[in-house]
Amino acid sequence: MEENKQRVKSMINILQLVAPGTPLREGIDNVLRAQTGGLIVLGYNEQIKSIVDGGFHINCAFSPASLYELAKMDGALILNETGSKILISNAQLVPESSIDSIETGMRHRTAERVAKQTGSLVVAISQRRNVITLYQGNLRYTLKDIGVILTKANQAIQTLEKYKAVWNDGITNLGILEFEEVVTMSEVVHVLHSVEMVLRIKNEILSYIHELGTEGRLIRLQLTELLADLEAEAALLIKDYYQEKTQDHHQILKKLQELANTQLLEDSDLVKLLGYPGQTSLEESVTPRGYRITSKISRVPPLIIENLINRFKTLQGVCRATINELDDVEGIGEVRAKKIREGLKRIQEHLYMSRHN
């Protein structure tokens, strides 16, 4: 899993470097349109030095126009790691010929071998096929047309909307069961599965956003709007049902995100994520602490909610508390105690109305 996280992080960094709207991408697109082809290496360390033969050491500031003009030469361009300077033009690259390559064209084969030998980012721009291919270590990625990525991103947003609706239905049903004191592990796991799918699709959309660069602003806004409050509520859901109260619920949500990125989770995986043994029955009754529901009461800060849960232990404990008992909790006076009682009643009524709509 750690290796996969590293690969994802590397790919995000690479895509941000060559995303539309960046000077480097503008230069690459100019070369692509001119159909001259090109080979660009980012980074000039000892390993790169050992495979560079000839070339002109120009050490000038990067500009898209300079890249376009210098790419007309047959050799490779060597840039610094950030792409802000062009260090060498028309360089011949001589990587180890024994390094395996799946490529057939000379330019792409050289790019793949250089990337594998040095770990540097290498960009190969095809002369005839209008394709930009990125290499770094064993990573290989072909940049897609912006129109294709936008179509995929919009499809993913539509899919996310469907899973958001599944989440809304599940969390509404769970809220009703919480007030009725009939929650089982099955209902909690069902809601967590919808969180898993939302997080999985979110990760896919983020990869499109990274690749789209400035063209992805609208997609990012849609994603932010769709996920508003969902992740915060999911963290409180975990806080409600995690076996040990002291566990950091944000860390558990982060772990769920990591797992969702790498595999489809079974019911037992989610049960274990909540701190229970994997063989725990899904029919087992579970009791919410009440963080998620009480956080919906207006003008009740998190510190007061913490005091409430510490005093009454569960959501039902809070619901059953009298005005005087609520008044005894630190930070809650008579006025706030009444607001808490009224707030819980309104939330319960809203949940029942939502289920029947």
UniProtKB/Swiss-Prot annotation:
Functional description taken from the UniProt entry: Participates in a DNA-damage check-point that is active prior to asymmetric division when DNA is damaged. DisA forms globular foci that rapidly scan along the chromosomes during sporulation, searching for lesions. When a lesion is present, DisA pauses at the lesion site. This triggers a cellular response that culminates in a temporary block in sporulation initiation.
- Which EC number applies? 2.7.7.85
Kindly list the positions annotated as binding ATP: G75, L93, M106, R107, H108, R109, T110
Q: Which residues form the DAC domain?
A: 8-146
Subunit? Homooctamer.
UniProt keyword terms in alphabetical order? ATP-binding, DNA damage, DNA repair, DNA-binding, Magnesium, Nucleotide-binding, Nucleotidyltransferase, Transferase
Q: Which family does it belong to?
A: Belongs to the DisA family.
Record InterPro entries: DisA, DisA_sf, DNA_integrity_DisA_N_sf, DNA_integrity_scan_DisA_link, DNA_integrity_scan_DisA_N, DNA_integrity_scanning_protein, RuvA_2-like
Q: Which domain of life is it from?
A: Bacteria
Instruction: Please give the Gene Ontology molecular function terms for this protein.
Output: adenylate cyclase activity; ATP binding; diadenylate cyclase activity; DNA binding
Known catalysed reaction(s)? 2 ATP = 3',3'-c-di-AMP + 2 diphosphate
- One Pfam family hit: DAC
Q: What are its GO biological-process terms?
A: DNA repair
Instruction: Tell me which PANTHER family the record gives.
Output: DIADENYLATE CYCLASE, DNA INTEGRITY SCANNING PROTEIN DISA
* Name recorded for this polypeptide: DNA integrity scanning protein DisA
Q: Please report the organism this UniProt entry assigns to the protein.
A: Bacillus cereus (strain AH187)
The cofactors required by this protein are: Mg(2+)
